[in-house]
Amino acid sequence: MSTTDTIVAQATPPGRGGVGILRVSGRAASEVAHAVLGKLPKPRYADYLPFKDVDGSTLDQGIALYFPGPNSFTGEDVLELQGHGGPVILDLLLKRILALPGLRIARPGEFSERAFLNDKLDLAQAEAIADLIDASSEQAARSAVNSLQGAFSARIHQLVEALTHLRIYVEAAIDFPDEEIDFLSDGKIEGQLNGVMADLEQVRTEARQGSLLREGMKVVIAGRPNAGKSSLLNALAGREAAIVTDIAGTTRDVLREHIHIDGMPLHIIDTAGLREANDEVERIGIERAWNEIEQADRVLFMVDGTTTDATEPAAIWPEFMARLPATLPITVVRNKADITGETLGLTKVNGHSLIRLSARTGEGIDLLRDHLKQSMGFTSNTEGGFLARRPHLQALETAARHLIQGHEQLVSAYAGELLAEELRLAQQSLSEITGEFSSDDLLGRIFSSFCIGK
């Protein structure tokens, strides 16, 4: 991981556009300016200049911006050239810059990586840049901006600071056991620990919301042929995404639709009807259906209400329930309520959710949308929220587990040394979110998923 050479990349998307931007970062940025512009622009002022080739001919003309380090995005000297967005022009300008000594193409995410390494961003803020670019809804974008501005990092730093303060008390109790006041047994440390655990649980709740905003919920519609699975997909999507006929086995492959329910991304997957396959193509489709089911966050078990009065999943189709992963949440959807005359609504049957609706007429679909949102614990229009990734949730869970174990050591045995170690491990897990304890390999994987010009 070299940060001594100077990097260049296109910061705007590939293809034609009104404006195309090349970004340069590193110690040779000023040399690039002199070579291409004939001068070094005044720092942080827009300068309209021709962009020159090696022979002095004009390649393009546009705006040049120069940001001397450390007062730049990366913390290094940065030069931005904003010209016309034609791919040929940008390619010629890029080749011109790369012909200079010490210049190379940036790796994906390397600008953000350098900003992180130069303490311009912490890891959570750097990841928020990619999340903002990838945001699929207004609420996700707003939460990504909050993360970029440090909302998530600030919550983590507060927890780390509280743990540091708590560790001081614990270490003092260990090092000075003969003092008049025993911090381990007088309840003070336990009270502070309970407070940190409560704060951490609140951050975990908000982080789960942020993870849902970023990654969404994967819902698989499964059931026998002709149960109305494709009709339900179309009803949820609000368009004719799947072919619907009265012929059993019309859907032969996996169909995917991406929608939003009050800001929560929902990945709906329609699958082939589950039965004994009639041919090789259908067999492959059914295998793919089971693969999707096993990876789902929730399964909508589609039942044709005209074929059975049963409401208990195991009574409807015991073989299907036997093959489902035991921990996989399911919602039984009794379809065709417009024909059976069943009352629309959501009920519980032996711990499983059951909803009666009509995918054909759309009756009960709004109820299903609300159910999906509530089943994931999603709250829309959360003010001041932040985005979170699965590794963030894992780090928060690990920290919570260490605090629980430390609390057990404290209340059962006043074991200061064991409590101190659990507090240290919890603090380390939290610091991984902001990058203070991240390995180079982990950082490489994170930043390689970014855009080239970021």
UniProtKB/Swiss-Prot annotation:
Binding site for (6S)-5-formyl-5,6,7,8-tetrahydrofolate: 23, 80, 120, 454
Keyword Zinc-finger: no
Binding site for GTP: 226-231, 245-251, 270-273, 335-338, 358-360
GO MF assignments: GTP binding; GTPase activity; metal ion binding
Protein's cellular compartments: Cytoplasm
Function (record text): Exhibits a very high intrinsic GTPase hydrolysis rate. Involved in the addition of a carboxymethylaminomethyl (cmnm) group at the wobble position (U34) of certain tRNAs, forming tRNA-cmnm(5)s(2)U34.
Subunit structure: Homodimer. Heterotetramer of two MnmE and two MnmG subunits.
Homology family: Belongs to the TRAFAC class TrmE-Era-EngA-EngB-Septin-like GTPase superfamily. TrmE GTPase family.
The protein, known as: tRNA modification GTPase MnmE
Organism annotation: Yersinia pestis
Gene of this entry: mnmE
